[in-house]
């Protein structure tokens, strides 16, 4: 369902891409989630959000969680909302860098409400 009036005129279409990993996974010497945020910055992508979870269930059925003494198993997500061209550049870069990570890619409408 489209919103009426000026809202729909300013809306853009693209993708919400979310990468799922754990705090202790790395790419090179850097935590993978932080590396993904830096990769987005390097590619000129205007925003990325790194979120930590309390607990998650991995694809292999293993529970991953933070505990009082060890944060290394903490599930983390990096989420970006990008246009189609940015998504293509991002995935090409990840392939070039041989990044191994699970992701979801959803078609979305996005924009900003109000005046800046």
What are these model-predicted stretches?
Residues 1-116:
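Positively charged, small/polar-rich N-terminal and surface patches that mediate targeting and assembly
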